[in-house]
């Protein structure tokens, strides 16, 4: 029996040596895995850099294509303008020739009359009369010539001064436009770079934090495995305790057998043998009582462990109950995403219908038969007014239909939201925090790109207040987006004009010279037209009608821009909702996997001091302070060496001492493992606190950067609006005097048409760019997920190999 006890003492030492060797192997494997992970991270960073470079290259190519398109459009517009000017020039030349022929006829009549008078004078008058008439005719001709020459010289001087002023104004405007365009470009590029940097940094931080959370989850999983092994050790200890109980029962029976013959002998006053044996019996009885007390304490500890196990099972059930609202929320978000998809499809269909109608209207306008020759200015004005009124009426009807449809869609969405809010039950559960999961962190991760309010759980107590605040915020955001969109359209139009001027400087210089020459030609015609209009008294009324039509057209354009901005905002919100739904699904899967693998647990561990027996500390905790376990083991050893006892009793006592020593060693190992686990849990909690602090700092920094960007955008919008207004005022002041109202309106309509075409093309181009970038981002995310799956598979393979090696060593 003593050999068996020694073998049992040697087995743990061999197990410890094997475990140490396995631990060293695992450490080496861990270092190799960490090196591989670092290499994979470097590869991922290289891939991201390459993707950013490719995106930059694609952006540059797109910008070049855009500039080429702009130059082509400018050339087309210039050609159209030249054609129109050529037609106007031909008409004016014809009118001038008609007027010249009329004046020639008048002069011919006067010459014939004078010739007849001269012939009459020549026939019936003398030389004196002839000379007097010739002198008078010469003087009159000289006076007329002088007056006409003075008038022409004065007109030439006025035209030269006007030309100089126009040249100076044009040069100043071109320089100012170039400077402002350069400033706007530089600011736009800097803002775009800052936005891309912020997005890249936020994505990098989110990925890093997710990797840290996954690593901590794996550590927790390994710790839970160690706990399972420790529970196995506890079960082994329970089995050993049962064996101890049996051995103690045998010891008690042996003591009863020893004490029974002594009781039968009657007591004598002077018996020395009874006096010698009584202290040994008392010692044995004390030791047996102490052993019984330790056994009871071990049983109590076993019951406590069972209670803790039951508590852990209750905690698992509670966590399962708490996961149910998250799943319900995910389902609600999926339904909402589907509804938004349906509404977006409807909006896209409506946009297509509107674009078709617009193209049909343009085709009708372009295919409209040419105007007949009008006999008077009144007919011309009436025809122009009728055409403009018809065009404006069509635009008004079209825009009114679009506005009605959009208001209906908006009312439908509002009704659906109200119905959802009224149908939602008010729940107020108390949610315990999960390890490695924070709902606010998920909301902060999705709020960098999302503007839609989906981060509110259905179980919050202040739903109505949050909904009112969200409605106010959405209205403010809508107004801000409309302002930003209008300002960007204006800035885009200005940039298009300025870039075209920079590219085709020589062509524009030639066109400018031609326009100035034509302006000088048209001035006389304009004065005649103004005189005729002043005579008829219709100039002010006509101008007022024109201004009213212009205002109405601007209002319609603003409505169109608002509707387009709302459509763009809805698309962005839908994309944000999709991204948030994907993130929530991914997080839900992670939580389900974590719940499946490792339920949460609560350890209350009191580490023991070095040099003190673990059983002694346990007895002191239970209130038994008289027992000294090292002394008890020594006494058992002494009893085992005592020769007065029988062999069976000695063997039982030796076995009890060995079992107690082994139990003490096992308990020390268990408590050491528990202390290490507790320390690891404390470290993980501290890491989680640091992670939460870092997350809060990052959120604050992101909010600050967003506010700075919003302020910068608002400032840019204000500057662009002031620049646009100033340019409009300058052009009206400087060129309004040179052209007639009709020509100004024609130029404005042509510019508006061109601007609409440019805006439509720019929107299509921006949509294409956004789609391509979203595809690139999705590909990058897919690549990252594949790499993470590969790393998980490698780690699982490594764990399987480690378990196999542990089994072999065991």
Curated annotation (Swiss-Prot):
Belongs to the JAKMIP family. Pfam families: JAKMIP_CC3. Highly expressed in brain, moderately expressed in thymus, spleen and lung, and weakly expressed in kidney, liver and peripheral blood lymphocytes. Also expressed in adrenal and pituitary glands, as well as testis. GO terms for cellular component: Golgi apparatus. It is found in: Golgi apparatus. Residues 261-274 have a biased composition (Basic and acidic residues). InterPro entries: JAKMIP, JAKMIP_C. One of its GO terms (molecular function) is kinase binding. The gene is JAKMIP2. Keywords: Coiled coil, Golgi apparatus. This is Janus kinase and microtubule-interacting protein 2. The lineage of its organism: Eukaryota, Metazoa, Chordata, Craniata, Vertebrata. Residues 261-280, 437-465 are annotated as: Disordered. Residues 13-102, 148-178, 207-244, 280-419, 468-597, 664-808 form a coiled coil. It comes from Homo sapiens (Human).
């Amino acid at each position: 029996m003593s050999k068996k006890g020694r073998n049992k003492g040697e087995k743990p030492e061999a197990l410890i040596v094997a475990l140490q060797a396995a631990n060293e192997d695992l450490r080496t494997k861990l270092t190799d895995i960490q090196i591989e992970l670092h290499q994979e991270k470097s590869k991922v960073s290289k891939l991201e850099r390459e993707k950013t470079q490719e995106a930059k290259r694609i952006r540059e190519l797109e910008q070049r294509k855009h500039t080429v398109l702009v130059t082509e459009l400018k050339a087309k517009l210039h050609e159209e303008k030249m054609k129109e000017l050529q037609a106007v020039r031909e008409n004016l030349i014809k009118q001038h020739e008609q007027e010249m022929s009329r004046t020639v006829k008048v002069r011919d009549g006067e010459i014939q009359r004078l010739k007849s008078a001269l012939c009459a004078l020549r026939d019936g008058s003398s030389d004196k009369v002839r000379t007097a008439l010739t002198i008078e005719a010469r003087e009159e001709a000289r006076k007329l010539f002088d007056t006409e020459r003075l008038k022409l010289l004065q007109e030439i001087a006025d035209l030269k001064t006007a030309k100089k002023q126009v040249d100076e104004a044009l040069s100043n405007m071109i320089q100012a436009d170039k400077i402002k365009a350069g400033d706007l470009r530089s600011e736009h590029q800097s803002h775009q770079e800052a936005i891309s940097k912020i997005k890249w940094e936020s994505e990098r931080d989110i990925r890093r934090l997710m990797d840290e959370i996954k690593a901590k989850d794996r550590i927790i999983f390994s710790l839970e495995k160690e706990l399972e092994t420790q529970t196995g050790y506890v079960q082994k200890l329970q089995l050993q305790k049962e064996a101890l109980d049996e051995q103690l029962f045998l010891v008690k029976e042996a003591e009863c057998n020893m004490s029974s013959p002594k009781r039968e002998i009657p007591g004598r006053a002077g018996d020395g043998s009874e006096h010698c044996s009584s202290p040994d019996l008392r010692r044995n009885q004390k030791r047996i009582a102490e052993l019984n007390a330790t056994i009871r304490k071990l049983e109590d500890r076993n019951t406590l462990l069972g209670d803790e196990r039951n508590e852990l099972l209750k905690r698992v059930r509670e966590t399962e109950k708490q996961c149910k609202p998250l799943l319900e929320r995910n389902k609600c978000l999926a339904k909402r995403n589907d509804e938004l998809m349906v509404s977006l499809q409807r909006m896209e269909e409506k946009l297509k219908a509107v674009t078709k109608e617009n193209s049909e209207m343009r085709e009708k306008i372009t295919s409209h038969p040419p105007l007949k020759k009008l006999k008077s200015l009144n007919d011309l004005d009436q025809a122009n007014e009728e055409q403009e009124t018809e065009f404006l009426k069509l635009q008004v009807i079209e825009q009114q239909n679009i506005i009605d449809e959009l208001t209906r869609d908006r009312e439908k969405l509002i009704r659906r939201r109200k119905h959802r809010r009224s149908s939602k039950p008010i729940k107020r559960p108390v949610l315990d925090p999960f390890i490695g999961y924070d709902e606010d962190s998920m909301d902060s991760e999705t709020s960098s790109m999302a503007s839609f309010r989906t981060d509110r759980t259905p179980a919050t107590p202040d739903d109505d207040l949050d909904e009112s605040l969200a409605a106010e915020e959405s209205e403010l955001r809508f107004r801000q987006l409309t302002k930003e969109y209008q300002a960007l359209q204006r800035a885009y139009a200005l940039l298009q004009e300025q870039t075209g001027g920079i590219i085709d400087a020589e062509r524009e210089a030639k066109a400018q010279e031609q326009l100035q020459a034509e302006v000088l030609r048209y001035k006389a015609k304009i004065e005649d037209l103004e005189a005729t209009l002043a005579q008829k008294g219709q100039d002010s009324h006509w101008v007022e009608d024109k201004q009213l039509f212009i205002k109405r057209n601007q209002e319609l354009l603003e409505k169109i821009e608002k509707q387009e901005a709302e459509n763009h905002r809805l698309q962005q919100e839908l994309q944000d909702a999709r991204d948030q739904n994907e993130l929530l699904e991914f997080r839900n899967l992670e939580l389900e996997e974590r719940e499946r693998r490792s339920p949460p647990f609560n350890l209350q561990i009191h580490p023991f001091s070095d040099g003190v027996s673990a059983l002694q500390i346990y007895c002191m905790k239970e209130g038994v302070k008289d027992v000294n376990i090292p002394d008890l083991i020594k006494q058992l050893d002494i009893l085992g060496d005592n020769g007065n006892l029988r062999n069976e009793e000695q063997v039982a006592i030796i076995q009890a001492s060995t079992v107690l020593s082994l139990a003490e060693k096992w308990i020390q190992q268990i408590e050491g493992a528990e202390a290490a686990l507790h320390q690891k849990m404390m470290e993980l909690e501290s890491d989680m606190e640091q992670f939460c602090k870092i997350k809060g700092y990052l959120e604050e920094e992101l909010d600050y950067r967003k506010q700075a960007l919003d302020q910068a955008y608002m400032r840019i919008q204000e500057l662009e609006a002031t620049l646009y207004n100033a340019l409009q005022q300058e052009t009206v002041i400087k060129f309004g005097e040179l052209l007639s109202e009709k020509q100004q309106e024609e130029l404005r309509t042509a510019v508006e048409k061109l601007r609409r075409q440019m805006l439509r093309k720019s929107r299509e181009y921006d949509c294409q760019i956004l789609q391509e970038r979203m595809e690139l981002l999705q590909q990058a995310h897919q690549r990252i997920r594949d790499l993470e799956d590969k790393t998980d598979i490698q780690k699982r393979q490594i764990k399987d190999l480690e378990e196999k090696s542990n089994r072999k060593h065991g």
